């Protein structure tokens, strides 16, 4: 299934945890509004956060409250962005993005998740060189979608690559062109499954033992269940 398998597997898990996902998205929206103001016309980070929330069907009331909280109308918490790197079972590379109001608490929680599941938390840079940070847009395959037309729309909008896999199309962009490519695809009438700035693994790693597979799944679940964790990236090839 490759990278798309990883994404669809993550999406199905997220669908079962909507309330927690909304809490995390609200935090991102609040931070973006605090740092760049509440007007999406002048705040690309806020627009991206709201677009991501809408892809998850987050209610508009929740989005509005998060913006007001960020701009100081509804109270304000101070969060910092931290990226942790480490290894899962059998050396699987893992990157964890967090937004936290307590660095020590979050570091302890993340370290505990790695330690409990056959991995270890590493130092900055220990695995990030195995990934490329890119815009990643996923469109689910449907009968009415013509692959060649979608590919041309994507490339003409500025995409770097277009990949067709079993269940979905993957469009890769530079970070700078992410918003314009995303808008170009949406304006052409395509519905997006996901659209994010992501750490994309250069190569994928397979786990051979059932024990390692269980540990890796548990590691991902423990990290994603943490309210401070925004995104978990890895180079494990999930076999669906």
Curated annotation (Swiss-Prot):
<protein>
    <recommendedName>
        <fullName>Probable transcriptional regulatory protein Clos_1778</fullName>
    </recommendedName>
</protein>
<dbReference type="InterPro" id="IPR002876">
    <property type="entry name" value="Transcrip_reg_TACO1-like"/>
</dbReference>
<dbReference type="GO" id="GO:0003677">
    <property type="term" value="F:DNA binding"/>
</dbReference>
<dbReference type="InterPro" id="IPR029072">
    <property type="entry name" value="YebC-like"/>
</dbReference>
<comment type="similarity">
    <text>Belongs to the TACO1 family.</text>
</comment>
<keyword id="KW-0238">DNA-binding</keyword>
<dbReference type="InterPro" id="IPR026564">
    <property type="entry name" value="Transcrip_reg_TACO1-like_dom3"/>
</dbReference>
<keyword id="KW-0805">Transcription regulation</keyword>
<keyword id="KW-0963">Cytoplasm</keyword>
<dbReference type="Pfam" id="PF01709">
    <property type="entry name" value="Transcrip_reg"/>
</dbReference>
<dbReference type="GO" id="GO:0005829">
    <property type="term" value="C:cytosol"/>
</dbReference>
<dbReference type="InterPro" id="IPR017856">
    <property type="entry name" value="Integrase-like_N"/>
</dbReference>
<dbReference type="GO" id="GO:0006355">
    <property type="term" value="P:regulation of DNA-templated transcription"/>
</dbReference>
<dbReference type="InterPro" id="IPR048300">
    <property type="entry name" value="TACO1_YebC-like_2nd/3rd_dom"/>
</dbReference>
<dbReference type="InterPro" id="IPR049083">
    <property type="entry name" value="TACO1_YebC_N"/>
</dbReference>
<dbReference type="Pfam" id="PF20772">
    <property type="entry name" value="TACO1_YebC_N"/>
</dbReference>
<keyword id="KW-0804">Transcription</keyword>
């Amino acid at each position: 299934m490759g990278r798309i398998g990883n994404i669809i597997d993550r999406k199905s898990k997220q669908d079962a945890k909507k309330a927690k996902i909304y809490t995390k998205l609200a935090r991102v929206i609040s931070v973006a509004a605090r740092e760049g103001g509440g007007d999406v016309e002048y705040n690309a980070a806020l627009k991206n956060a709201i677009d991501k929330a809408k892809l998850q069907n987050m209610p508009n009331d929740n989005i509005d409250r998060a913006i007001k909280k960020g701009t100081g109308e509804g109270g304000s918490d101070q969060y910092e962005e931290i990226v942790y790197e480490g290894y899962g079972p059998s050396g699987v590379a893992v990157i964890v993005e967090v937004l936290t109001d307590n660095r020590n608490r979050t570091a302890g929680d993340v370290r505990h998740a790695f330690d409990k599941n056959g991995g270890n938390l590493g130092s900055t840079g220990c695995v990030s060189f195995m990934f490329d940070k890119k815009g990643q847009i996923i469109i689910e395959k449907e009968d009415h979608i013509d692959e060649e037309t979608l590919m041309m729309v994507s490339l003409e909008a500025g995409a770097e690559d277009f990949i067709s896999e079993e269940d979905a199309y993957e469009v890769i962009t530079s970070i700078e062109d992410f918003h314009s490519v995303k808008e170009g695809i949406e304006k052409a009438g395509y519905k997006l499954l996901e659209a994010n700035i992501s750490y994309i693994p250069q190569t994928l790693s397979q786990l051979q033992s059932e024990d390692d597979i269980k540990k890796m799944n548990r590691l991902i679940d423990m990290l994603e269940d943490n309210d401070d964790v925004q995104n978990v990236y890895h180079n494990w090839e999930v076999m669906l």
